[in-house]
Amino acid sequence: MTPEQLIALDQQHVWHPYASMDNPPPTYPVVSANGVRLTLADGQEIIDGMASWWCTVHGYNHPHLNEAMHLQIDNMSHVMFGGITHEPAVTLAKRLVDLTPAGLDKVFFADSGSVAVEVAIKMALQYWHSKAQPNKNRMLTIRNGYHGDTFGAMAVCDPINGMHSLFASVLPQHHFVDAPPMGFDRPMEEGDLTELEDKMREHQHGIAA
């Protein structure tokens, strides 16, 4: 299949993320990836500065990761985690716990950042429900954040001013404050967290996390 044929079929049958179905942006066929570079069908190399949406922080085609994947897929590619376990998952969980502060002793595996946010929200809601305080069911977060594209994650991404404003009328309502102004070029100052502290006090009986 030529690159031109591939692009034509792509435009016919693939709906890319964050792209219009009727007027999609250009797509670039990739034939290989190594380190931080993607090789296109025409031989051009480009740097993937986004690390495949932050998923390839160690680079593409990393020999250690490739070896681990080959070894694993020779045994099994995947099994459900409900009522079943296996050594790689248990070993990874133990290594993660060893890296975290005392008291964080359990690991819940999720398949994406959005799902991780969904699960975290559900954990907070379930915690307060178990404490007989189901009214604590709102999140407190900063405006203009990005936490994912699933339903619960969109609700804490500033649905009014952010990229998910189309869904604002049907998303759960949460509490938002402006992001503190300190940054890499400005140290934290007294008062930077005043709005956050005020909002926490104002809605303390309804905030889950």
Where would I find each of the regions flagged by the language model?
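A structural motif shared across PLP-dependent enzymes of the aminotransferase-like
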Residues: P29-T39, W54-L71, G82-K94, A155
